[in-house]
Amino acid sequence: MDASAINNLFLIGALLVAASILVSAFGTRFGIPILVIFLAVGMLAGTDGPGGIVFNNYPLAYLVGNLALAVILLDGGMRTRVSSFRVALWPSLSLATVGVVITAGLTGLAAAWLFNLTLLEGLLIGAIVGSTDAAAVFSLLGGRGLNERVSSTLEIESGSNDPMAVFLTVTLIAMLASGQTGFSWDLPIQLVQQFGLGALLGLGGGWLLLKLINRMELATGLYPLLVVSGGLIIFAITTAVGGSGILAIYLCGLLLGNRPIRSRHGILHMLDGLTWLAQIGMFLVLGLLITPHELLPIALPALALALWMILFARPLSIFLGLLPFRAFHDRERIFIAWVGLRGAVPIILAVFPLMAGLPNAQLFFNVAFFIVIVSLLLQGTSLPLAAKLMRVTVPPEPAPVSRAGLEVHPTSQWELFVYRLGAEKWCIGAALRELNMPEGTRIAALFRGRELLHPSGSTRLEAGDLLCVIGHEHDLPALGKLFSQAPKRGQDLRFFGDFVLEGDAELAAVAALYGLKLDGLDGHQPLGRFIAHEIGGEPVVGDQVEWQGLTWTVASMEGNKVRKVGVRFPEGSRPGPGLFL
């Protein structure tokens, strides 16, 4: 390759990335998933598009896909809070194992019949498309305001179900290549090895990487590079010894993100950019790899297979996988079933048969690609509507307009939060000394217009003020309530109910206030504990139960404890005046 060809490669690559970014700004206005846009740009630049680029280098696509997926999972792990495991760990693991097997099996049976394949070939297609995609889930769920049980289950499932799909795919390819027709008893051992080594090396390697980062004094910009390179080392070593590198790098990120670490905000900031670049690069390459005219002959059976998987196989796997977990409402199960987003992982797995030289390998690849497109277009675009219909969203927590880390010491967790005060804020007109600031927080600066004020305790806040507060992440809920908008009738109150009660209130007192019958219940127990017991499992904000003809909604949580409960009366009923006290 001469200098001119290299320069042209740089130019084409930069143009494709820039085009993807610019087009995505228009596409998102029409509700088109951003990953579909990246994929479409790659297809337009490919063989059948105006770009006419011929790209059929499957090993390179495999390399790019795995590298991008590793970066995406590392970032996703660092942004996942361990506290979410309280409600979602075991359900997610059930879906990541049993759920994938059921989805792959049912989809494989249908694929064998629709495409006139052998049972093993059909099951291979099922295994290829059997797992949800972390890149798609993290990208499309961000900022949707889903309740914690649903969002955590979907995110942890997508970050941990790829090992099962990879294991099934590799096993079936080996069986087809060797002519083996029966399953070996070694398979469960190999499965345990994949998950066991992935978990052990991911957590162990992550701990060693954390210690190294916190002991090394480097230039600020080098810490993110050390995290990425360390994560990739763990990914590669785990894969080399027969474990799941995908699971290992996700758990590595999870450990790093939930422990005190140097330059946390710098690491997350750079990882955010790298993750976007990884998603763009991965979907561009996969878009270049496909030849659209080859999809036309298989369009009808592939569409039928996609609909079978979306409407039957995935929902059945969800309902069976979540059967032991009674805290999940049917509407939550339906929504989780619908958000079985397929993305880059099935396409990457579909490269495996091509690299192994299996018969019908191109068919497997084309079918997987078609299913991914249908999934992103159908499920991705309808996600906001599905969330609304299934009532799995909750009012967003008030958040600062910006936040930045303060490197006071190597593992400092101090942050600077910036709040813009609108006219509807509770605190407008209040003197600074009157603010009930959370313990350990301080007002660092107050801007009015373009001027930096020198505030005193008597300074009164005005609409439009910019308030800078120093605190910790755990102070955000209290600060949000302090500087949040005054709730308008019909917004948050409409969601949580007509009134919001303290979770510590005695059940007997609440029953007396509303004229309810306890029917032998312990009246001395707190209302929050009673509601949590009625929900079953671990409660989250937005959980609802019906009791005594009223709807009771968890309005606020503090750790595992229900702190506030909303109550809604039936339409047309008129609560007594005592309720307004």
Swiss-Prot record:
Pfam families: CorC_HlyC, Na_H_Exchanger, TrkA_C. One of its GO terms (biological process) is cell volume homeostasis. The chain crosses the membrane at residues 6-26, 34-54, 58-78, 95-115, 122-142, 163-183, 189-209, 231-251, 280-300, 303-323, 334-354, 363-383. It is found in: Cell inner membrane. SUPFAM superfamilies: FAD-binding/transporter-associated domain-like (SSF56176), TrkA C-terminal domain-like (SSF116726). It is a multi-pass membrane protein. The keyword Coiled coil does not apply. InterPro entries: Cation/H_exchanger_TM (IPR006153), FAD-bd_PCMH-like_sf (IPR036318), FAD-bd_PCMH_sub2 (IPR016169), Na+/solute_symporter_sf (IPR038770), NhaP2 (IPR023729), RCK_C (IPR006037), RCK_C_sf (IPR036721), Transptr-assoc_dom (IPR005170). It comes from the Bacteria. Keywords: Antiport, Cell inner membrane, Cell membrane, Ion transport, Membrane, Potassium, Potassium transport, Transmembrane, Transmembrane helix, Transport. One of its GO terms (cellular component) is plasma membrane. Its main location: membrane. One of its GO terms (molecular function) is potassium:proton antiporter activity. The keyword Methyltransferase does not apply. It catalyses: K(+)(in) + H(+)(out) = K(+)(out) + H(+)(in). Residues 404-485 form the RCK C-terminal domain. Belongs to the monovalent cation:proton antiporter 1 (CPA1) transporter (TC 2.A.36) family. NhaP2 subfamily. K(+)/H(+) antiporter that extrudes potassium in exchange for external protons and maintains the internal concentration of potassium under toxic levels. NCBIfam families: PRK05326.1-1, PRK05326.1-2, PRK05326.1-3. This is K(+)/H(+) antiporter NhaP2.
